[in-house]
């Protein structure tokens, strides 16, 4: 029994940093930055009072299983750098929140699992944390932001990266930086939850590959029962291929494999030739 406990401890240790970021820990991880001083004031928000700080954006954070936000600050005269560190229930939730706020106006940067920023802003995810940083400084503080961001990312999760399922998506035709994770309401259906997506292009047409994690084969079956009730289809539900005739989203080819439902979705509701190859390739990796 002791040997089993030691083995469990060995495997769990690497994950401790993913669940133990207290406000005091986060503040202690802030690096020294020339000319800037870490403020002694730290604000902490939870699901009950997050609206007090970010108001209209709070519902999306809660949908992504937000747990706690720690707000910290550097000061340099009248200038400041604000860091908001959002802790979520899982790394997938943190990645999902980050991906929902990607902006085409920002540059991608090598911080954490993925990052975006400019001369006054930096946003990234690492472990189960989503971090937003910005400054009111009139000059370019991108270097300072990246120094702070990299130091925090290293402490939160030194090996930060995309969720394991995202790494399995086929490379051919993949649009860079288009990966996302949706906790619920994928393509407008509340029962389509825990969905990983990636955008693709093929022969001038765009589409998404998606993977729904049902948690178990029974979980996927329950999702399909709800979907078939919506589409009024009476197809036999068994593992393998199925065509969902969604009256709002067009025909959606899916493939059920174990705890996963893999599919192809096109915003115009079109069927795209050749996507069945990508569908099968992805399913075989799961």
Model-derived segments and spans:
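Soluble, non-membrane globular domain cores that form compact, hydrophobic packing
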Residues: 18-286
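Bacterial N-terminal signal peptides
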Residues: 7-17
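Positively charged n-region of N-terminal signal peptides that target proteins for export
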Residues: 1-7
């Amino acid at each position: 029994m002791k040997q089993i406990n030691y083995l469990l401890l060995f495997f769990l240790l690497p994950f401790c940093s993913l669940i133990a970021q207290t406000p005091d820990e986060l503040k202690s991880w802030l690096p020294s930055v020339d000319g800037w001083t870490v403020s002694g004031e730290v604000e902490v928000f939870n699901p009950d009072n997050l609206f007090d700080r970010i108001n209209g954006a709070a519902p999306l954070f809660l949908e992504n299983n937000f747990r706690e936000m720690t707000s910290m600050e550097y000061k340099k005269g009248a200038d400041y750098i604000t860091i908001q560190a959002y802790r979520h229930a899982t790394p997938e939730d943190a990645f999902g929140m980050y991906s929902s706020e990607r902006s085409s106006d920002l540059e991608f940067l090598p911080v954490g699992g993925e990052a975006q920023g400019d001369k006054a802003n930096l946003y990234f995810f690492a472990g189960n944390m989503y971090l937003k940083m910005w400054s009111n400084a009139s000059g370019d503080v991108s270097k300072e932001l990246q120094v702070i961001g990299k130091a925090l990312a290293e402490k939160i999760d030194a090996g930060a990266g995309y969720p394991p399922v995202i790494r399995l998506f086929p490379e051919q035709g993949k649009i860079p930086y288009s990966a996302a994770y949706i906790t619920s309401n994928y393509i407008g259906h509340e029962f389509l939850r825990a969905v990983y997506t990636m955008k693709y292009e093929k022969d001038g047409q765009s589409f998404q590959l998606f993977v729904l994690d049902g948690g178990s084969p029974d979980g996927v079956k329950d999702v399909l029962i709800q979907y078939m009730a919506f589409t009024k289809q009476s197809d036999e539900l068994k593992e393998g291929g199925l065509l969902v005739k969604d009256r709002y989203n067009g025909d959606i080819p899916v493939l059920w494999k174990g705890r996963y439902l893999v599919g192809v979705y096109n915003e115009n509701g079109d069927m795209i030739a050749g996507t069945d190859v990508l569908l099968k390739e992805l399913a075989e990796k799961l």
